[in-house]
């Protein structure tokens, strides 16, 4: 499939927050249209959908992929791109129009959480090359690799995310799910046996949580 080099592939993630967040998509779309942005957009439809759509866009030749969503959607998108068959993954620009509850990536990079400046930033082709981290692990007997842009949590942090995702089905709101996860773990002090190697240093022991971040100075 041949795609114009300047055309955006936009993935809108409607589940990234509340009804107010979903409503803002119409305003974002109208603003992109008013700016003459050439784009195709697709809407995610459930768990794993953003990753699958990002992979399809990368395979179909889109070299600017824009996520309208939060940190979770952004993480799924980078995995879709990295797991795609595109030969020039390093030339794919991943943009973000913050539209979720958690926008840590945008805040860290000083990106506006307002959609108009975010769209303008992408239009002006303001690019920065950053690292992509990855984590190899086993899910049962199956070896897997996941990529990340912000951080990867092992132990307590990962447990909180897992419980949040599970309880979100019942609470419906991510914030309440997060509070429920914290409450359920408040009396739990589970330690994990780990062996960490950081450069030439080895750390062995029972550890509650580890957070590995990509930081820039």
Predicted regions and their residues:
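ATP/NTP phosphate-donor binding region
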Residues: 1-68, 79
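Short, glycine/acidic-enriched loop or turn micro-motifs at the edges of active sites
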Residues: 16, 74, 101
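Catalytic core of DAGKc-family lipid kinases
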Residues: 35, 83-212
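Short alpha-helical
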Residues: 48-49, 72, 155
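Short Gly/Thr/Asp-enriched flexible loops that form oxyanion-binding sites at enzyme active sites
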Residues: 73-86
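Conserved small/polar residues in nucleotide/adenosyl-binding loops
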Residues: 216-217
């Amino acid at each position: 499939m041949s795609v114009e080099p300047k055309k955006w592939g936009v993935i809108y993630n409607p589940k990234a927050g509340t009804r107010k967040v979903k409503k803002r998509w119409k305003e974002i779309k109208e603003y992109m249209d008013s700016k003459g942005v050439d784009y195709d957009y697709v809407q995610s439809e459930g768990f794993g959908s953003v990753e699958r759509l990002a992979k399809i866009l990368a395979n179909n030749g889109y070299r600017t992929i824009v996520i309208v969503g939060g940190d979770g959607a952004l993480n799924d998108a980078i995995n879709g791109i990295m797991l795609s068959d595109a030969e020039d993954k390093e030339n794919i620009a991943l943009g973000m129009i913050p539209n979720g509850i958690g926008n840590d990536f945008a805040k860290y990079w000083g990106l506006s959480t307002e959609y108009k400046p975010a769209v303008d930033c992408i239009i002006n082709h303001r690019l920065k090359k950053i690292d992509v981290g990855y984590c190899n692990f086993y899910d049962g007997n199956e070896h897997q690799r996941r990529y990340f842009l912000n951080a990867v949590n092992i132990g307590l942090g990962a447990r909180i995310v897992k419980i949040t995702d599970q309880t979100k089905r019942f609470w419906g709101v991510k914030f309440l799910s997060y509070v429920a996860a914290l409450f359920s773990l408040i009396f739990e002090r589970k330690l994990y046996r780990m062996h960490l190697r950081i450069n030439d240093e080895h750390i062995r022991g029972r550890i509650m949580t580890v957070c590995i971040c990509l930081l820039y100075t």
